[in-house]
């Protein structure tokens, strides 16, 4: 109550001074004398920020005691809200009695103002910058225009604001409007106490003033002018967080073109139309400007929140990626650490094997046996990497061994490929799956013809169309060439024969298989020669059904020919008939080449009156293979399959002299076989 009396005395003193017309002009109180207290409460909530501008400019303009009685009307000008102005003209006692809470706030605001002069070092600098903006002129001229034009729309705008920001301000009184922000003001008043406690010159009343100022600032968005000035002034204070200051300065510059109240309303409308995120930012700025130095800390917090959320969203995505990479690196690191010794030791083994190959074949088997348990000790991940290393080392060693062997074979022509003198023959048939003719030529595959000098040379899996044949194979001196490979075919077969055949037939009479090129039949005087490349069942037996269809067609075809003449079948049959015909029969029962279906079809074929010449001569020989996968250095370890055969009619078996497997001949994953006949 004593504060109310002080206000009355100050109001009486001001009534005699010429400062009274300004609040009358700003308030337009003559028209609103009959209005209710509720309308008076609504309007002040809107004009609060402008009153602050006037007070700040007045305090910065004059620090003498004469300004202090003017500060009371400016506090009343904070009552631009039309409360104190109406009280001066319409009856001081009654109006003061109604807004008791406001009168206390006004006194609280009027009392600490002389104390503000103590820390003027910090506060006066930004206020001095605000002086060039004619604050009293704006109060006298622009506010009445803005209010006269926008008193009712401001209520609508305030309602719109309250819907998005503080819904309690439009419907409630000054106390109700102050209550919801009190909770927020308490949260933000704590840093003000901490920051303002450092100079030690400001009392509790000033803290209350800051709280009330913060409350009012939250209730309105007209603080854009003060925000602009504060944003321009803040870079000086924002030396601690320079990054946030730069962002604030940019945002302040964006708001600069609206210094007037009308511009403020436009900016507020634009902000209301903008999404709530953008509207939330100016709110926090208004709070920051009222709290003074707290803006330094509060702005980075409020502004950092959206950035932090974005950073979290962005961080959450790369962070797990990094963790996954780290975890994958850890897992891969373990594998790599385990794989590195394997890769380092294995090429060492491969290097040892390469010279061993040149020396003895028996040592290769011993080294392979020694290497097996070492690999068995390693983990499966390391084993998965072994084939790649072994392929490279194997390919290198095979090339070296190939050159060495070709040189030795050239020198050992008769010794390596000739039969003993006691075995007489007059026909030599050689068969080889070259796994690509052009690659085979680059690996000096044609040397076999010079070394072996076969009478008939059968090739499978040439993978080369007739119009794409290299010149080296189009014309071999002394041979009649017969090719079958359709364009785009992946199979392809060919026959080179020194003896002119009576008739040559291409294919099996089925488009499904003849389009690829799988069989050529050459009729000679005393037999039929069939050069065949049987379809592979494929991984996971995807081609097993076509393979079964082929088997039926082939059996019918061979049976028809065998009724006319003896038949000699050479080529890649893509099956290991018996467990002795492959290194690991138990592990391959469900793999292509050793399925029960394929083996049964081979048994059926032999049951039609045909004989496997190799098993006829060497029924118990083990380790006799014609195919080795490129993986796991299988050929060096002789982990292979016998897939290439020479089958003859039973009546032609007595004419078979020898069946040789030329495992020393490189250039393909298969090796050639040579059959000697004495017809």
From Swiss-Prot:
Probably binds two magnesium or manganese ions per subunit. InterPro entries: AP_endonuc_1, AP_endonuclease_F1_BS, AP_endonuclease_F1_CS, Endo/exonu/phosph_ase_sf, Endo/exonuclease/phosphatase. Mg(2+) 1 binds at residues 461, 669. Keywords: DNA damage, DNA repair, Hydrolase, Magnesium, Metal-binding, Nucleus, Phosphoprotein. It holds the Pfam family Exo_endo_phos. The modification Phosphothreonine is found at residues 133, 140. Plays a role in the cellular response to oxidative stress by promoting DNA repair mechanisms such as base excision repair and possibly homologous recombination repair. Functions as an apurinic/apyrimidinic (AP) endodeoxyribonuclease in the DNA base excision repair (BER) pathway of DNA lesions induced by oxidative and alkylating agents. Likely to initiate repair of AP sites in DNA by catalyzing hydrolytic incision of the phosphodiester backbone immediately adjacent to the damage, generating a single-strand break with 5'-deoxyribose phosphate and 3'-hydroxyl ends. This is Recombination repair protein 1. It comes from Drosophila melanogaster (Fruit fly). The lineage of its organism: Eukaryota, Metazoa, Ecdysozoa, Arthropoda, Hexapoda.
